[in-house]
Amino acid sequence: MGTVSSRRSWWPLPLLLLLLLLLGPAGARAQEDEDGDYEELVLALRSEEDGLAEAPEHGTTATFHRCAKDPWRLPGTYVVVLKEETHLSQSERTARRLQAQAAHRGYLTKILHVFHGLLPGFLVKMSGDLLELALKLPHVDYIEEDSSVFAQSIPWNLERITPPRYRADEYQPPDGGSLVEVYLLDTSIQSDHREIEGRVMVTDFENVPEEDGTRFHRQASKCDSHGTHLAGVVSGRDAGVAKGASMRSLRVLNCQGKGTVSGTLIGLEFIRKSQLVRPVGPLVVLLPLAGGYSRVLNAACQRLARAGVVLVTAAGNFRDDACLYSPASAPEVITVGATNAQDQPVTLGTLGTNFGRCVDLFAPGEDIIGASSDCSTCFVSQSGTSQAAAHVAGIAAMMLSAEPELTLAELRQRLIHFSAKDVINEAWFPEDQRVLTPNLVAALPPSTHGAGWQLFCRTVWSAHSGPTRMATAVARCAPDEELLSCSSFSRSGKRRGERMEAQGGKLVCRAHNAFGGEGVYAIARCCLLPQANCSVHTAPPAEAGMGTRVHCHQQGHVLTGCSSHWEVEDLGTHKPPVLRPRGQPNQCVGHREASIHASCCRAPGLECKVKEHGIPAPQEQVTVACEEGWTLTGCSALPGTSHVLGAYAVDNTCVVRNRDVSTAGSTSEEAVAAVAICCRSRHLAQASQELQ
């Protein structure tokens, strides 16, 4: 599973020089022919190494990363990532310095690629013995061992993603995506297939590893199978989603559907350079592949996304947490799981679609009919999260064609908003993943008109914190989103609340674990609120009285969310963030030993109200939803006892979870209510009605 077909030993320099002398010119030429891909191996003198010497950077420690799945590792090839502001000349000089110092120690190295334009760094082939040396070089941020990535594939689908008003005898989308270009990083493609002929441009980019096995026979139909099928799903004449979109293909997977992290990185860099040289309209990049978690691949996706490119990727076919794989775990990427014709998670033998908090939504991914590379008119059925991602890439192309100025955050929010809700049987997922996995199946919006006038929000879960008392978890919104509220959740119920705090110029949601707890999640409510001015007001624990209170005191600001955290382990029957609209402006009220935080925002025409749903006796779950035209921005529990596991938003519904009431020993005095803050913009709603 390496990037070259065989492994080579690393010879000590004195022995290598002796062999070269013994072999003579003929032997040297033969060796040179055999090792043609080693033409840049460096034998440097000590004086050259000294000439490249630079003062080491103090106070910084570079780190080493490798794939957690051993069979996927590619030892001997490493991506050296340099600090963000490193110039190309410094990257090249750092690479030469590594070669010189390695040669002085008797090791041969080869610089395979120098990155620039997307991220600074270089790809090097070297012995693992040199890692300690490389980590100490100037400008080095971290080093990642290369690893493998894999294709993720094993006509109801078009009907499923089409809103009822558009359904007829055949699929006729409202916009074909003609203004959008889709880049596909996959295998090679049979570009003369009738489905995609004239719609796909095969670029000259190719970066793939050798196929495994000396007897592997490269049949064109197999080499082109995965890429041809996906190109047809995205923009095929008959079976495509975005029939008007144009495509460009880059080959990063070999005939066995295998590629490398480094090859994918170089492909993304190629796209960024093409974008700079030939600026066009909206770009969508489809990554129908998955490998182990990769910090460098996620970083490259982040850079490309912040340059205005929409990236869509497969969640993976391993029936596992998608956060353990890349690029599925990158927050800036739209990650897609797979469902079947009954809107249930796809099962692929003993495996199936990935799931979890890193998945944004699901899409059709079982028995998808598309172009076959067997002949220019053949069709074939394939399954997997690659096919699901291709559907979302097609939907994204049509949405961007209708609204070319959409940002990634706006596009993601629309994909979530217009998805089919609560149609997936969650029992298929592991119990600890059900609350984290979105119950959403992608669909086209019924109309783009008026969509921009809605208040869009989504729920973002953090990673699970550690079990120690001081452990915390942090949930973050995208750069273009506003954090309007913060909540927390613990399966054991042992937590110390949550708070909103500034970090790197942005508000984040931080949740606190408690002593004896098993860990906690932070849950952020992230919204698109143009021209918003938001802040957090905090009231420390009250010195006297029955509770702590805080409200929005700035003129024109409204309350969008409450949060609370405390240092004591057990507040007993306490009141964490609740709303008291009676007689006073909406305010957050909590236990006197807790700090209370109010999220207050001002935006054109923004108005918010409180909805509460209580029950006379405790239940395992209490919910309250916002009405049509209103959007849930805040979710909390009232009064909240030690039996409350937490509160979180699911679409437009506030959910409060309690411990199992049959074993928790609850009483009627500990009844729980779910409290929702529902907001809308009067200004935007009026503008929407005028358009309609």
UniProtKB/Swiss-Prot annotation:
GO terms for biological process: apoptotic process; cholesterol metabolic process; low-density lipoprotein particle receptor catabolic process; proteolysis; regulation of neuron apoptotic process. Cleavage by furin and PCSK5 generates a truncated inactive protein that is unable to induce LDLR degradation. The record marks 152-153, 218-219 as: Cleavage. The modification Phosphoserine is found at residues 47, 688. Residues 31-152 form a propeptide. GO terms for molecular function: apolipoprotein binding; low-density lipoprotein particle binding; serine-type endopeptidase activity; very-low-density lipoprotein particle binding. Monomer. Can self-associate to form dimers and higher multimers which may have increased LDLR degrading activity. The precursor protein but not the mature protein may form multimers. Interacts with APOB, VLDLR, LRP8/APOER2 and BACE1. The full-length immature form (pro-PCSK9) interacts with SCNN1A, SCNN1B and SCNN1G. The pro-PCSK9 form (via C-terminal domain) interacts with LDLR. Interacts (via the C-terminal domain) with ANXA2 (via repeat Annexin 1); the interaction inhibits the degradation of LDLR. This is Proprotein convertase subtilisin/kexin type 9. It comes from Pan paniscus (Pygmy chimpanzee). The lineage of its organism: Eukaryota, Metazoa, Chordata, Craniata, Vertebrata. The gene is PCSK9.
